[in-house]
UniProtKB/Swiss-Prot annotation:
Gene it is expressed from: prx6
Family indicated by similarity: Belongs to the short-chain dehydrogenases/reductases (SDR) family.
Protein name: Short-chain dehydrogenase/reductase prx6
SUPFAM superfamilies noted in UniProt: NAD(P)-binding Rossmann-fold domains (SSF51735)
Residues annotated for NADP(+) binding in this entry: I27, D70, N97, Y174, K178, V208, T210
E.C. number: 1.1.99.-
First-tier enzyme category under EC: oxidoreductase
Record's keyword terms, sorted: NADP, Oxidoreductase
One Gene Ontology cellular component: cytoplasm
Organism: Penicillium rubens (strain ATCC 28089 / DSM 1075 / NRRL 1951 / Wisconsin 54-1255) (Penicillium chrysogenum)
Length: 298
């Protein structure tokens, strides 16, 4: 990210554990520790105040703060960004790591014997609110506050999942949110890079031994199929320290490997491509100015 005379500032969302043990290892917790060890100032964000306060005991007091907030609540999340900017005067990176899995069953097997008029309740879509809306909210807030950095711009790295590409049948809604995140990132990346000097990319972990994964599932997996958190941290570092201008990249973190995933080729060539090429009058009508993309249709 170039040279800096002041420590860089990162917001790490999803920094608290989902278990009763507030310091049980998780991607957000380990990411916060890793960034602090490299000299970053880190704003840790999570829903659990007690877990956040416990986390701070394991971080440098002069470089880490905790902010209790729900990323699916725009006002709460915006308040965090505002407080961080007022505290440190800049936001260089958003690590959008908050995430949960399905909290209800879409398959409703327990309702097989219900009468036709006994309609099941709506599914709990908290997973959509946190995993997808939280990323969209965080991205918009990052755009706003990174415009006010001493050198405008910054980095956004999102924790996705390999389930976005190869869906897990146990968690269909979770995998749907992660697939949506991938396409959202690819959709906004060119404009953020060109107009805002912001790069947005995604890391996709496989099975990581964290609180979001049931311990019984970990026990049922052979060791070579487990991805160490350290591999995910390498993925984050790849994007946070990139000097080549990567944007819209999707990076699988699998065991000890980092693997890039690319967009498929258009099935019907230029006809398929034309359907998703920016038409400038529509872009201006939707967003207030032209995109300026090199392949846009005037």
């Amino acid at each position: 990210m170039g040279s800096y005379t002041e420590p860089r500032v990162a917001i790490v969302a999803g920094a608290t554990s989902l278990t009763r043990d507030p310091l049980q290892s998780g991607i957000g917790i380990d990411l916060a520790k890793d960034l602090c060890s490299k000299g970053w100032k880190v704003a840790c964000v999570g829903r659990r105040q007690e877990a956040g306060e416990a986390l701070l005991k394991d971080l440098p007091q002069d470089r880490a703060y905790f902010f209790a907030a729900d990323v699916s609540n725009y006002e709460q999340y915006a308040s965090v960004f505002s407080k961080v900017h007022h505290l440190w005067g800049r936001i260089d990176a958003l690590c959008a790591n908050a995430g949960i899995v399905d909290t209800s069953s879409l398959y409703i097997y327990g309702s097989k014997n219900n009468g036709v008029d006994n309609i099941p309740p709506a599914p709990d879509l908290s997973v959509v609110d946190i995993n997808y809306k939280g990323v969209v909210y965080g991205t918009q807030l990052a755009i706003h506050f990174m415009r006010h950095n001493p050198q405008p711009g910054g980095r956004i790295v999102v924790t996705g999942s390999i389930g976005a590409v190869f869906p897990h049948k146990t968690y269909p809604v979770y995998c749907g949110t992660k697939a949506a995140v991938n396409h959202f990132i690819r959709g906004v990346a060119p404009l953020l890079k060109q107009k805002e000097n912001i790069s947005i990319n995604c890391v996709m972990p496989g099975i990581v031994n964290t609180p979001i994964v049931p311990p019984e599932m970990i026990a049922a997996v052979t060791p070579e199929c487990i991805t160490p958190v350290q591999t995910v941290l390498r993925g984050y570092e790849t994007f946070l320290e990139d000097s080549t201008g990567m944007a819209g990249e999707i990076l699988e973190c699998s065991a000890d490997k980092l693997i890039y995933y690319h967009m498929p080729k258009p099935g019907n060539g230029h006809i398929t491509k034309r359907a998703v090429t920016v038409w400038e009058p529509l872009f201006r009508m939707s967003h207030g100015e032209v995109s300026g993309l090199p392949d846009a249709i005037p």
